[in-house]
């Protein structure tokens, strides 16, 4: 199920579906939590998320999912979100990697998402090195 906001980012509405897409597309999940009565949320939607650079970065590296306060209260509680706007980044297994609260100018927002991406890559590399089964598969693949 998809919802289109006034920009080119495709916003999913199901976290489970976003995880499936992230896994099949080798991306991270960006979960955004907003409130219609929140000035910082509206500024984030109307300025930051409409920036070409932000749209391009999110589309390239993330599957985006959006939740609105009042409508998606269950998701706010599930993820422990009490302040808005909140941006959470998850790996394709649903592990939270990054959480930032508040308004960010476009360049700073891209920088923060880039940090989340690096953190996810570092975590994945660490897990890969620590998993003997994955190491054996990698060695076999390299020998082929």
Name each model feature, range by range.
Residues 77-79:
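Short amphipathic alpha-helix with an adjacent loop that forms part of the alpha/beta core around
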Residues 49-50, 82-123:
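Non-catalytic, surface beta->alpha helical segment in thiol-disulfide oxidoreductase systems
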Residues 25-38:
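Short active-site neighborhood of thiol/selenol oxidoreductases, capturing the structured segment around
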Residues 42-46:
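Detector for the c-type heme attachment site
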Residues 7-13, 33-35, 47-73:
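Thiol-based oxidoreductase modules, predominantly thioredoxin-like and allied folds used
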Residues 1-25, 118-139:
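N-terminal leader/targeting and pre-domain segments
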């Amino acid at each position: 199920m998809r919802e289109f906001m006034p920009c080119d980012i495709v916003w999913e509405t199901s976290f489970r579906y976003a995880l499936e897409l992230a896994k099949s597309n080798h991306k991270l999940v960006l979960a955004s939590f907003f409130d219609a009565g929140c000035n910082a949320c509206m500024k984030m939607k109307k300025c930051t998320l409409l920036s070409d650079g932000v749209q391009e970065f999110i589309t390239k590296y993330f599957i985006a999912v959006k939740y609105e306060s009042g409508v998606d209260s269950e998701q706010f509680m599930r993820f422990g979100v009490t302040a808005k706007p909140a941006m959470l980044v998850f790996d394709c297994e649903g592990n939270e990697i990054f959480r930032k609260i508040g308004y960010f100018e476009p360049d700073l927002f891209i920088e923060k998402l880039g940090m989340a991406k690096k953190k996810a890559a570092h975590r994945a590399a660490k897990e890969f090195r620590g998993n003997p089964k994955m190491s054996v598969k990698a060695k076999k693949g390299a020998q082929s």
